Amino acid sequence: MQLLTIGKNQAGQRLDKFLKKALPNAGTGFLYKMLRKKNITLNGKKAEGKEILAQGDEVKCFFSEETYASLSGAGAAEDTSDYRKAYRSLKDISVLYEDENILLLNKPAGVLTQKAKPEDLSLNEWLIGHLLAAAAIKETDLATFHPSVCNRLDRNTSGIVLCGKTLAGSQALSRIIKDRSVKKYYQTVCKGKILQESTLEGYLYKDERTNTVQVFPDMAEAPEDASFIKTIYTPSAVAGEYTLLTVELVTGKTHQIRAHLASTGHPLLGDTKYGDNKLNRRMQSEYSLHHQLLHAGRVCFPEEAEGPLAKVSGQTFDAPLPHKFAEILQALNLTPDSAC
């Protein structure tokens, strides 16, 4: 008999989902048969598989050692070298907040949030490497749950990324992202003078082939599969022909802020996809800026009295501006005290 005690990383998922991860070489039909015959029990009782697991639950498998080893793939532990390599090699990543369920990471520009190719090292690998190095998780925990980033930033956008340490934490973060109860604010510098707050609405279409997007003012002009987008921006400072903006990302679509502002004639400084090429060349020459100035600087959590997000209920977290961003603001005289 094998006893599997549910830890905080596994809690919150259905029993059948857990069994498929714990026994990856077992077929779905076989697992349900074992549940019906009570060869697999939950807390000493017969189970159907749809039960939601809680921390401390006991799953017993009445198999021979040989059968269990074959079904679980024992001896074929996951290769964690990429996680450890990412943790050693990816620089300037900092932890803004961490508890038993979630982390908030500050990602520098130039680091992928998730892999684009199998050989890539991303923030996702760094996260698991960090947790392994801190002994917050064990290698064996990865058999049933992988901690993961829950929102994505473009490679060359810096700032706050929400991450789930446990399944319950990941599910809660995904929920508040989906229902938009978590508020996300960005800082950027755009071309042109913007003197008042504005709300932009439109429809965004992504060309998967070129990984670019196009913004349309209304659905009548947009392709059928275009997505509704909403962006709210407020000028924080204006100097010369540049504006420092605080942008609330109401909907979170690919390249939304970059494309939406560019569509109004206010492209982001340094944006090579949607920006002003002449201006970008000047920024490269004068400030060695080779990417868009866009920073996910603030996250505001909704009020939640209980559950995995209770410790961050109603809290606001800020990520400091990258050095290059702050340097350019000073050079352009774009301080929050500048007249708007």
Predicted regions and their residues:
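RNA pseudouridine synthases
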Residues: 1-340
